[in-house]
C-alpha cells in the first residue's frame, strides 16, 4: 500500500479577476473555484488517476477539515486523517489577476499527542509499503519531524519517498530513503554550487547517494529530468512539448508517476517516463494531471 502524509492540508479558494487587483478597493471576481490540496494529497490524487490505491494521512481540524475530508471522499480518495480538537484546517486565498497574489492560512497547531497518533498509524505499515513525505513542516512541529518518523520506521522495510528541501532533505539521508526528488536548483543549494550540466547534476546526485539516498530524481523544469538509480545507472529524459499554464502540483505529480511506474513495471526507466509525463500533464493543465492527459503525453516521451 502507498501512504501519503500531508501535515497541513488546505482548501485553496482561487479567485480569478479580469482586471488587475486594486488594493484597498472592492474587486469583483470573474470566476472562482475551491481546490482541496496539500502536497501529499496531490500525490494521492494523481495516483488515483493512474489506478494506484493510496491512503492519505495527516491532520485536519474544525468545519473546514470536515469539509475537506468529505470532498476528498467524493473524489474517491481514501483518507485516515487525525482530527485535532482545536483550530481549523487552513484556507488559502489565491487571486489570479494577471499576476498571482496569495494569502495562505497558518493551519492548526499540532500537539505532541497527535504526532504520537500519527506514529502509531505508521507503526502498522508493512514491509514494502511506500510512505511519501512531501513539503514543509508546520511551525508547531519540530523541523526534525521527518527524521523522527523515518527513525521510527527503521527495520520495518518501508520504502520512504521524501520530497523536501535543504535540511529537511539532508537530515533524512542516513535513514536511506527509497527516493528523494530535489529539483536542480535545490540540489545546487544542498551541495553549495550552481549546477549547469548533466555531469554536474549527476555528481551532486551521487554525493547524496553516498550520504544514504537510494534513488535520486532531479527535476529540471523544461529541461526534463535526470535519475541516478540505486544500481548506479543514470537515466536522462526530456520533456514533451506543451504550454506551461500551471506550476502547482507538478512536482507532486512527478512523484506519483514515478512511484506508480516503478510499482507497475519494476523498471526505473519506465518510472522516470511516467513521472515525467505526469509532471508535464499537470504543468500543461489548469488542475492536476488526468489519466487522459498522461496517456497522451506518454506517447511523446
What residues fall within each predicted segment?
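Short beta-strands and strand-loop turn motifs
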Residues: 102-104, 129-135, 163, 181-186
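Conserved N-terminal subdomain of the carbohydrate kinase-like
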Residues: 23-25, 49-129, 298-301
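Glycine-rich phosphate/adenosyl-contacting loop at the front of the ribokinase-like
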Residues: 1-57, 65-67
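Gly/Ala-rich phosphate-binding loop of Rossmann-like dinucleotide-binding domains
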Residues: 48, 154, 263
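Conserved phosphate-binding/catalytic region of the ribokinase-like
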Residues: 170, 198-301
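Conserved phosphate/ATP/ADP-binding segment of small-molecule kinases
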Residues: 144-231
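Short, small-residue-enriched loops and turns at beta-alpha junctions
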Residues: 108-111, 137-141, 168-170, 189, ...
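Hydrophobic anchor at the start of a short beta-strand
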Residues: 2, 52-54, 79-80, 160, ...
Amino acid at each position: 500500500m502507498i501512504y501519503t502524509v500531508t501535515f497541513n492540508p488546505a482548501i485553496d479558494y482561487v479567485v480569478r479577476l479580469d482586471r488587475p487587483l486594486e488594493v484597498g478597493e472592492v474587486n469583483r471576481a470573474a470566476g472562482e473555484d475551491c481546490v482541496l490540496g496539500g502536497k501529499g494529497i496531490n500525490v494521492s490524487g494523481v495516483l488515483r488517476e493512474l489506478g494506484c490505491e493510496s491512503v492519505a494521512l495527516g491532520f485536519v481540524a474544525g468545519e473546514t477539515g470536515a469539509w475537506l475530508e468529505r470532498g476528498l471522499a467524493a473524489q474517491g480518495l481514501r483518507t485516515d486523517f487525525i482530527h485535532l480538537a482545536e483550530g481549523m484546517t487552513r484556507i488559502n486565498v489565491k487571486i489570479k489577476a494577471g499576476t498571482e497574489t496569495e494569502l495562505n492560512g497558518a493551519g492548526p497547531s499540532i500537539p505532541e499527542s497527535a504526532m504520537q497518533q500519527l506514529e502509531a498509524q505508521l507503526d502498522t505499515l508493512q514491509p514494502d509499503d511506500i510512505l511519501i513525505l512531501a513539503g514543509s513542516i508546520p511551525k508547531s512541529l519540530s523541523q526534525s519531524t521527518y527524521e523522527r518518523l523515518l527513525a521510527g520506521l527503521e527495520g520495518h522495510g518501508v520504502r520512504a519517498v521524501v520530497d523536501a528541501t535543504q535540511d529537511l532533505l539532508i537530515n533524512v539521508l542516513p535513514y536511506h530513503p527509497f527516493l528523494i526528488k530535489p529539483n536542480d536548483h535545490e540540489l545546487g543549494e544542498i551541495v553549495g554550487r550552481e549546477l549547469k550540466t548533466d555531469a554536474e547534476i549527476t555528481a551532486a546526485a551521487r554525493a547524496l547517494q553516498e550520504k544514504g539516498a537510494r534513488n535520486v530524481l532531479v527535476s529540471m523544469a523544461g529541461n526534463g529530468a535526470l535519475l541516478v538509480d540505486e544500481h548506479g545507472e543514470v537515466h536522462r529524459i526530456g520533456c514533451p512539448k506543451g504550454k506551461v499554464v500551471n506550476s502547482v502540483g507538478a512536482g507532486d505529480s512527478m512523484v506519483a508517476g514515478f512511484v506508480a511506474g516503478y510499482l507497475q513495471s519494476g523498471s526505473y526507466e519506465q518510472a522516470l517516463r511516467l513521472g515525467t509525463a505526469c509532471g508535464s500533464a499537470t504543468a500543461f493543465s489548469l488542475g492536476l494531471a488526468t489519466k487522459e492527459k498522461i496517456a497522451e503525453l506518454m506517447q511523446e516521451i
